[in-house]
Amino acid sequence: MGNRWRKLAWRCWVVVLAVAAVVIPVASAADTEASAVPANLVGRWTRTVTAADWKRAGATGFVTSFVGPYTMAVKANGKVSIIDFTATFSPLSGGRLSIRGVPVCYPKKGLYRWKVANRKLTLTKLKDTCAAEVGLFTGVWTRA
């Protein structure tokens, strides 16, 4: 009976370790996925995206038909609600941030410079290979 219990105990430990190996990294990734953004970046922002914005970004296809006003809500944890999806702003040093989570761009992320002055948020592309993300985010946003 002792040998049987040892096998059972061993199997239980294997299951526990397997579950821990999956759950712990997922929880850690979720915790670090979005980090706190500066307070002056938090809030609701609006801007009108034009056909010229899409053209400048080099966008083609269906996204170029999405012209008009957009509102994004930036939360303190870096989550950004825009259109019908949630992107993530991750602050970096030197007034820069990375943007990721745009469905048509996934898993790519873009690098942008940001500045807030006089209730205006300016996002400037530094490096981003996804034209849809560039066309949507690059430009001047007004605090709503």
Where are these regions (language model features)?
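N-terminal helix-cap/turn-to-beta initiation motif at the start of protein domains
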Residues: 30-46, 53, 73
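Intrinsically disordered, low-complexity regions enriched in Ser/Pro/Gly/Gln/His and often acidic
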Residues: 1-6, 18, 37-39, 47, ...
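Short, solvent-exposed mixed-charge patches
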Residues: 142-144
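Contiguous, well-ordered beta-strand patches that form the walls/edges
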Residues: 51-136
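Secretory targeting and sorting signals
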Residues: 2-30
